[in-house]
């Protein structure tokens, strides 16, 4: 395993978290590392090194190939993308500069607004989302 330096330490730590999540999803799918690698079009030794945290999280294209090979549902796909340091699919599609998303994020991050009011704002957003996503948890 590569020895962490100040420059690589954080990336390898995130690689370990990504690897653990990847391994969990692979096992849940009942796939061997070799089968997952074949389905994703990558080398089996690369899957092994990813799972062991010996590689930095991969580029988005490889994560997307792993998601497809694992047949992950949307929530798990986003978890794997985020663990690799990528935006979830909805944010990737909308773009991180979507004005509505920025406004919501700005309000939720504004510590001048009392925590209880920010919690209520989250609840209002979740309630509004129920119209299109009935499974939305209410914070």
Residues covered by each model-derived region:
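C-terminal regulatory/oligomerization modules of transcriptional regulators
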Residues: 108-139
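Residues in the recognition helix of alpha-helical DNA-binding motifs
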Residues: 25, 39, 50, 80-83
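The alpha-helix within a helix-turn-helix
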Residues: 26, 37, 67
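Short alpha-helical DNA-recognition segment
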Residues: 30-49
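Residues within the helices of the helix-turn-helix
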Residues: 23, 34, 64
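Short amphipathic recognition helices of helix-turn-helix/homeodomain-type DNA-binding modules
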Residues: 61, 74-100
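Short, basic-rich loop-to-helix N-cap that marks the start of a DNA-contacting helix
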Residues: 54-68
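A short, Lys/Arg-rich alpha-helix, primarily the initiator
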Residues: 2-29, 120
């Amino acid at each position: 395993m590569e020895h962490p330096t100040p420059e690589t330490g954080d990336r390898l730590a995130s690689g370990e978290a990504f690897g653990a999540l990847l391994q969990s999803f692979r096992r849940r799918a009942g796939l061997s590392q070799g089968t997952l690698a074949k389905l994703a079009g990558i080398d089996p030794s690369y899957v092994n090194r990813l799972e062991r945290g010996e590689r930095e999280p991969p580029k988005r294209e490889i994560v997307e190939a792993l998601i497809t090979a694992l047949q992950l549902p949307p929530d798990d796909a986003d978890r794997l993308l985020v663990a690799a340091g990528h935006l979830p699919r909805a944010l990737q599609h909308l773009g991180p500069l979507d004005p509505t998303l920025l406004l919501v994020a700005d309000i939720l991050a504004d510590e001048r607004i009392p925590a209880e009011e920010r919690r209520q704002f989250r609840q209002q957003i979740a309630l509004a989302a129920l119209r299109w996503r009935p499974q939305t948890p209410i914070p």
